[in-house]
């Protein structure tokens, strides 16, 4: 019974899933990254019907984040499943993509 209660308590502490409306309100702190996000990422990552993981959706981003930032960067640059190559951001540099990935996964401010 103790294990069941502990699991229930942990589940109650988990953040509620983010909604597309909540994801649409999120913006990177850096103005340049915010502009790139608005122009290239937001249309899919704030749309619950796009198939892309929502911005700051911890449940969706956790397994991706565990793959490592280098893998995620490769997915963005090369394209992966529904993700178009370069994420439709031809103006983005590798550092921009890394900042966008950290923002999307709710790890903004972290480095490698």
Label for each model-derived stretch:
Residues 54, 75-98, 104-107, 111-112:
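Axial heme c-ligation environment in periplasmic c-type cytochrome domains
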Residues 21-29:
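Short Cys/His-rich Zn2+-coordinating modules
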Residues 37-47, 100, 104:
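The canonical Cys-X-X-Cys-His
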Residues 1-3:
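Bacterial N-terminal signal peptides that target proteins for export
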Residues 14-17:
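Bacterial signal peptide processing site
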Residues 30-38, 106, 110-111:
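Short sequence/structural segments immediately N-terminal
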Residues 9-12:
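C-terminal motif of bacterial Sec signal peptides marking the signal peptidase cleavage site
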Residues 46-74:
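Gly/Gly-Pro-rich "capping" loops immediately C-terminal to redox-active cysteine motifs
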């Amino acid at each position: 019974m103790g294990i069941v209660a502990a699991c229930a308590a942990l589940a109650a502490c988990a953040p509620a899933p983010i909604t597309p409306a909540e994801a649409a309100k999120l913006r990177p702190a850096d103005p340049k990254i915010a502009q790139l996000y608005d122009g290239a990422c937001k249309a899919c990552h704030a749309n619950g019907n796009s198939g892309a993981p929502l911005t700051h959706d911890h449940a969706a981003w956790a397994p991706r984040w565990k793959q490592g930032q280098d893998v995620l960067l490769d997915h963005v640059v090369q394209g992966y499943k529904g993700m178009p190559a370069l994420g439709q951001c031809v103006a983005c540099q590798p550092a921009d993509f890394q900042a966008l990935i950290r923002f999307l996964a709710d790890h903004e401010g972290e480095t490698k």
